[in-house]
C-alpha cells in the first residue's frame, strides 16, 4: 500500500474482508489495523514532469511467482529490508534474482528508527549478496541511543524526523561532519566506478 504526499491511494481489496471492490485506504490505517497487502498493487503519479508507474508486491516467499512477473516488466526495483544486520540474509534471494535478471535496484531500510546495529554493519552483511557495491546514501543521526533523523549524503543536508509530518531540515550535527564528508567521498567514488 502506498500514500502520495500523505494522501491515501486506491487499492484493489480491503485486507480485513477480502472484498474485491475498489476502496480508498490510507497506509497508516492499513498498518494501524495490523493488515498488509497480499497482492500486487499498482499506482502511478507525476513528479517533476515525469510519469512514474509503481508496482507494490508483497515480499514473502509465498508471493515469489507474482513478484517474478512484476520484476520482468520493471525498470528498477526497490527492495525493502529490515534494519537488523542479523536478518540481512532474508534479502538474499531477491538480491540474487535481481542481479541475475539485470534489473537495477536500490535498497530501502525500513524502520531505521528501530535499528539496533549500524548502517555499515548492515551493508557489510548485505554486500556478499550483491554483485554491485552497496553504498549508503543516508546515514542516521543518533541522539541518546535513538535515531532521530538522517544526513543525506547526496544533498549534503540533515533532516530531523517529526512524527506524522515531513522531516525538518537541520544543520548537519558537528559530531557527524567528518563522517559525512568521508562517507560522501566514498559514495561518489563508488558511483564513479
Name each region found by the language model.
Residues 1-68, 72-81, 178:
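P-loop NTPase switch module centered on the Walker A-proximal segment
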Residues 2-4, 13, 17-18, 81-193:
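P-loop NTPase catalytic nucleotide-binding module
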Amino acid at each position: 500500500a502506498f500514500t502520495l504526499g500523505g494522501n491515501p491511494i486506491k487499492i484493489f481489496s480491503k485486507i480485513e474482508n477480502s472484498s474485491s471492490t475498489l476502496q480508498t485506504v490510507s497506509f497508516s490505517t492499513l498498518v494501524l489495523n495490523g493488515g498488509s497487502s497480499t497482492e500486487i498493487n499498482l499506482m502511478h503519479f507525476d513528479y517533476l514532469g515525469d510519469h512514474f508507474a509503481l508496482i507494490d508486491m508483497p515480499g514473502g516467499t509465498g508471493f515469489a511467482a507474482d513478484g517474478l512477473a512484476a520484476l520482468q516488466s520493471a525498470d528498477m526495483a526497490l527492495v525493502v529490508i529490515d534494519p537488523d544486520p542479523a536478518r540481512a540474509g532474508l534479502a538474499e534471494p531477491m538480491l540474487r534474482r535481481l542481479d541475475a535478471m539485470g534489473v537495477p535496484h536500490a535498497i530501502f531500510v525500513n524502520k531505521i528508527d528501530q535499528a539496533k546495529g549500524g548502517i555499515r554493519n548492515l551493508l557489510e552483511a548485505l554486500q556478499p549478496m550483491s554483485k554491485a557495491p552497496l553504498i549508503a546514501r543516508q546515514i542516521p543521526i543518533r541522539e541518546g541511543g535513538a535515531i532521530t533523523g538522517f544526513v543525506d549524503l547526496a544533498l549534503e543536508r540533515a533532516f530531523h524526523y517529526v512524527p506524522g509530518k515531513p522531516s525538518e531540515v537541520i544543520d548537519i550535527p558537528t559530531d557527524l561532519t567528518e563522517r559525512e564528508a568521508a562517507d560522501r567521498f566514498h559514495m561518489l567514488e563508488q558511483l564513479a566506478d
